[in-house]
Amino acid sequence: MTTKEKIIITSLELFAQKGYDGVSVREIAAKVGVQASALYKHFSNKDEILNGVVSATSEKIKESYQVNQIPEAVKNKDEITQSYEAFSTRQLCDLTWNIFQLFTKDPMVSNFRKLLMREQFENKHIAKLYDDFFVEGAVNNFAKIFQQFSADGFFKPVDSRMIALHFYAPIQLLFQKYDCEPECESQIKELLYQHIELFGKNFSAKN
């Protein structure tokens, strides 16, 4: 691991624990085990470190989507609907659970999510990041996919944004439940699977 990568990972851990404003560059440097002057060779200030965290986490999410063969990450746009149609309900549930675990268990992605949740009320820039990653941005991304599903006859001709809200809102709630009660993982997994099954029954054009 390079010094720059250590700075990013350590900074994210500290930000998630203490809040963005509660961590100094000097503290980050000490935790990494370098002088502050060495840290400044990679990042000129704390805002640049945050930008590095965002870029690194975005890349981690992208790589995880590719590893899990998420269709929108590995297929052409005109192949996405067909790819999802080929999945069984169980496969869709397993796929969704894998991504749920990415956002709740992966150290980098989980800390990033917690950082944005924690700091959204204190920092407008971080509030915008939270909205882009986990609220409006997520809903918009799902809406685009579901709009294509409806256009291709896979889903019922329902407003795609409403479909996205029906899909994503329960998952956001389960994120919160996991953060509060990680010991209830098996129950959360069962709820997630039930949600995916019911969602498919409600919006599939075959039903």
Residue ranges and their predicted role:
Residues 66-106, 164-167:
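Hydrophobic alpha-helical connector segments
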Residues 128-132, 136, 146-197:
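Hydrophobic/aromatic-rich alpha-helical bundle segments in the mid-to-C-terminal region
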Residues 55-62, 67-69:
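Short, basic, alpha-helical segments at the C-terminal edge of helix-turn-helix-like DNA-binding modules
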Residues 90, 104-151:
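Amphipathic alpha-helical packing segments from all-alpha helical-bundle domains
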Residues 6, 14-57:
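Helix-turn-helix
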Residues 53, 91, 95, 108-112, ...:
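Residue-level detector of well-ordered alpha-helical segments, enriched
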